[in-house]
């Protein structure tokens, strides 16, 4: 504190040459620190087909990853968060053995049946069109790059996988306590963060998430009775209905899936919720954003939602 006081006194002292020198020094220091800062970036393009009967989905994603670090990268890591929701997983064992477990978890993972566990099974992974080998350890996939990723350059991963959505215990899953059929967060193979300390391929045991900020272009094909809300902006309200874009109803074939297309920029994750009982209302705030409300009339206080 005394140093700060002395500095203010010095700057107020009428010695222009020294004052100018000191201000220039601080300005240069700020520019230097800013010039040294870097952050990785990623762009996801996904196409997802949901099976609402068995709570599984087939996924494809193209991931463009830009290396803004000063380092050459020889490998990459992806998080497979759904793998945590299996008996004997690291998260399960931890939740059953620590002194103060999360009351939402305790031994619930251990009791999940084969149709209630979560998993993500990778079927194909390439880098710039070249096949990659990979190994999975719990909730982390590790791959060695076919081509090193140099500083300032970008590379493209393509991945196909099958996943089963777990019965909800924490953030993500099906049939949560509010009765929502699908609550989807951290649900796709997610590229791990790389920063000044290196890669962060942390096993998921129920703590917060650290990942790359980026853009998401996500297409979800799902049973036509389901209403979705997702991160970002819906791109095809005319194909969806349910009040999006003022469109009430869109007729589809008997067994046809409804396609939802969302885009989101500069976000940390893409999440969505889906339920056949959702009611959707959109409200334009004066001089503000367009707000979307989704609720189940059977479980929510609909009168209060209407007042909003």
What are these regions (language model features)?
Residues 46-49, 63, 131-133, 144-148, ...:
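Beta-strand-rich interaction surfaces with strong enrichment in secreted/lumenal proteins
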Residues 62-84, 89, 100-103:
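Ligand-binding face of N-terminal immunoglobulin V-set domains in extracellular IgSF glycoproteins
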Residues 190-198, 206-308:
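Hydrophobic helix-coil surface modules that form long, contiguous segments used
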Residues 1-38:
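Bacterial Sec-dependent N-terminal signal peptides
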Residues 66, 103-179:
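A surface-exposed beta-strand-loop module
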Residues 33-58, 178, 185:
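N-terminal, polar/Ser/Thr-rich
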Residues 61-63, 67, 80, 153-167, ...:
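Short, hydrophobic/aromatic-enriched beta-strand segments in well-ordered soluble domains
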Residues 90-102, 163-216, 281-286:
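Glycine/proline-rich low-complexity spacer/linker segments in large multi-domain proteins
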């Amino acid at each position: 504190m005394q140093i700060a006081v002395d500095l203010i006194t010095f700057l107020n002292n009428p010695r222009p040459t020294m004052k100018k020198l000191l201000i220039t020094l601080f300005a240069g220091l700020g520019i230097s620190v800013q010039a040294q800062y870097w952050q990785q970036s990623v762009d996801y393009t996904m196409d997802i087909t949901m099976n609402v009967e068995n709570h599984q989905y087939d996924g494809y994603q193209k991931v463009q990853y830009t290396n803004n670090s000063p380092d050459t990268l020889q490998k990459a890591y992806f998080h497979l968060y759904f793998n945590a929701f299996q008996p004997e997983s690291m998260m399960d064992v931890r939740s059953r053995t620590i002194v103060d477990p999360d009351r939402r978890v305790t031994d619930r993972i251990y009791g999940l049946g084969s149709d209630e566990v979560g998993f993500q099974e990778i079927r194909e992974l390439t880098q710039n069109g070249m096949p990659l080998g990979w190994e999975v350890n719990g909730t982390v996939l590790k791959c060695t790059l076919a081509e090193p990723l140099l500083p300032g350059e970008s590379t493209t991963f393509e991945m196909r996988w099958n996943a089963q959505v777990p019965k909800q215990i924490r953030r993500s899953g099906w049939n949560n306590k509010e009765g929502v059929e699908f609550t989807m967060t951290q649900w796709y193979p997610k590229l791990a963060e790389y920063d000044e300390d290196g890669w962060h391929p942390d096993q998921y045991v129920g703590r917060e998430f650290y990942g790359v900020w980026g853009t998401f272009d996500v297409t979800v094909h799902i049973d036509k009775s389901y209403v979705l809300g997702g991160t970002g902006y819906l791109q095809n309200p005319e194909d969806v209905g349910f009040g999006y874009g003022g469109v009430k109803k869109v007729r589809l074939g008997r067994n046809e899936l409804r396609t939802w297309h969302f885009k989101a920029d500069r976000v940390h994750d893409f999440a969505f919720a889906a339920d056949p009982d959702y009611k959707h209302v959109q409200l334009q705030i004066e001089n503000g954003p367009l707000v979307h409300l989704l609720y189940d009339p059977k479980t929510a206080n609909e009168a209060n939602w209407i007042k909003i």
